[in-house]
Structure formats: structure tokens, C-alpha cells
Amino acid sequence: MTATAQQLEFLKNSIQSIPDYPKPGILFRDVTSLLEDPKAYALSIELLVERYRHAGITKVVGTEARGFLFGAPVALGLGVGFVPVRKPGKLPRKTFAEDYALEYGTDTLELHCDAIQPGDVVLVVDDLLATGGTIEATVNLIRRAGGSVKDAAFIINLFDLSGEARLKALGVESYSLVSFPGH
């Protein structure tokens, strides 16, 4: 099934916009409202699975935490393994770590060293693309493990925050079900 304009509008309307959260001047796009609607949640997964069904994906990677909510069911739909990328100290085996910049400071993400094998073709799935910092760190981890990133898929793209351009500079195509301006 290819996404129709009506389906995408349904998904977009299922995402609540919360003004002045987490601080004044921000219009927060709340993907949890999509998760609360079983039809919207199922449709978002179905559309992503259909898009990547014949893309040769061997692993799906999701970034903590909401990337797990979308990435794991997409992996099941594709019949491939799901690999979590987590915050430091949450994975029990040996990990690769990647620091990345936040608006104020830095953070770190980790990936099990043996979760991605050389030659794996990886789809990264997350809930939202904004500036692309988290996804860039995730892509770097996958590449360090020997995998290649086929695409990065999102439910929401905040199109004016440069995340798509950042991914393109890394040689990664991005796809989003819906787009909003970022505030």
C-alpha cells in the first residue's frame, strides 16, 4: 500500500501540538497522541513496513526511547532483527559509544558492538527528525560496527530545523510520514 494523502492527513491530525512546551515559544509535536490511537499507530507502522519491504534491509535500529516504539514493530513487519541504541550504561555487553552535541552540552549514545555485522543494511527508525544530532550519532555507531545505513525513517520531520540536510551530508536519505515547521 502506498501512502495516500488522506492517510497522511489522518496521521498528521492524530499528532497533538502543545504550545509553550517544554518552554515558552516552543510548539511541541506530541507523537504520543498518535500512539494512543490504535488505527493511527498501526497505519504508521504499516506504511513504513510497506515502503521498506523490498529494500534489502537486514536490521532496524531505533534510538532511545521513542525510536523503540516505532522501530521494533517495523522490524517485525520486515522480518528482521531490531537493534536498540541507548543512553550510556543501559546495554550489558561491550558497546561502541558516540558523543553528540545538544543545544546546551553533550550526550552519548551506545550500541552493542556485536549487534550490527559488516554487510548489514540498516534502516534507522525514530519518531522525530529535528536538527539531526541524535540520528547522526546513531548513523556513526552503525558505521563503526560495519553496517551501512540504507535510510532513516521518521514519523515527524520538523522541516525547517535542518535535519534532512544533515543526513544528506552523511549520505543518508530520509523519509518522514508527516512534516511540520519547527518552532
UniProtKB/Swiss-Prot annotation:
Coiled-coil features, chain-numbered ranges: none
Catalytic reactions on record: AMP + diphosphate = 5-phospho-alpha-D-ribose 1-diphosphate + adenine
Localization, UniProt: Cytoplasm
Similarity section: Belongs to the purine/pyrimidine phosphoribosyltransferase family.
Assigned keywords, A-Z: Cytoplasm, Glycosyltransferase, Purine salvage, Transferase
Known EC number: 2.4.2.7
Primary localisation category: cytoplasm
HAMAP family listed in its UniProt record: Aden_phosphoribosyltr
Organism in which the protein naturally occurs: Erwinia tasmaniensis (strain DSM 17950 / CFBP 7177 / CIP 109463 / NCPPB 4357 / Et1/99)
Name this protein carries in UniProt: Adenine phosphoribosyltransferase
Keyword Cell membrane in annotation: no
Subunit structure: Homodimer.
NCBIfam families (alphabetical): apt, PRK02304.1-1, PRK02304.1-3, PRK02304.1-5
GO term, biological process aspect, one: AMP salvage
Pathway membership: Purine metabolism; AMP biosynthesis via salvage pathway; AMP from adenine: step 1/1
Keyword Transferase: yes
Cellular component GO terms, alphabetical: cytoplasm
PROSITE patterns: PUR_PYR_PR_TRANSFER (PS00103)
GO molecular function: adenine binding; adenine phosphoribosyltransferase activity; AMP binding
Functional summary from the UniProt entry: Catalyzes a salvage reaction resulting in the formation of AMP, that is energically less costly than de novo synthesis.
Gene3D superfamilies recorded: 3.40.50.2020
Disulfide bonds: none
